[in-house]
């Protein structure tokens, strides 16, 4: 296990298996030394987390949705690097 995986474990973050593309796009693209990750959406319990902060969702719910997206991005990066985030 690498440094980044160890740090994720310390933070209690478990990376989900990256979702398959839901439409006609690829989840990530490697170009030279760069990895471009497609847009990630917050999905919780099989449903999209949507809404306007302060109107239909709370600030805490919005923060959780952003965290879900960030974790999904890291998951895609791990897939792109063949499980080597370091």
Q: Which residues does each PLM region occupy?
A:
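Short, polar/acidic, helix-capping and beta-turn segments at strand->helix junctions
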Residues: 1-86
